Amino acid sequence: MIRTFRHKGLERFFRTGITSGIQAMHANRLRLILAQLDQSKAIADMNTPGLAVHPLKGDRKGTWAVTVQANWRITFRYENGNAEVVNYEDYH
């Protein structure tokens, strides 16, 4: 289950479907990723074909990322079976 968001536009999209805070061309992919993330209890639940889930390194160790498109990612941490600090970012 998704407990907290860092990106307010992504949270608004997740709760209402309003795309004003995200790139509209990413809406369908974001909807798929967020639905999967909200249903997951562990990182293994996110390891489905096409999601490209991967751990981050260095100072971002403990954070996971899912590719949205090109450099855009959904990043998050798991705490007690919940996705926390869910963010929508281009960190490259």
Tell what function each PLM region has.
Residues 1-33:
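Arg/Lys-rich, positively charged N-terminal/basic patches that mediate binding to nucleic acids
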Residues 1, 9, 18, 42, ...:
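Glycine-rich, flexible loop/turn motifs
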Residues 54-57, 64-92:
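Enriched for short, Lys/Arg-rich terminal
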Residues 28, 36-40, 60-63, 82:
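Alpha-helix boundary/capping detector
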Residues 14, 34, 38-45:
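Short amphipathic alpha-helical segments enriched in hydrophobics
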Residues 5, 25, 29-32, 38, ...:
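Generic alpha-helix structural propensity
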Residues 41-64:
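A short, surface-exposed loop/turn module that caps and links secondary-structure elements
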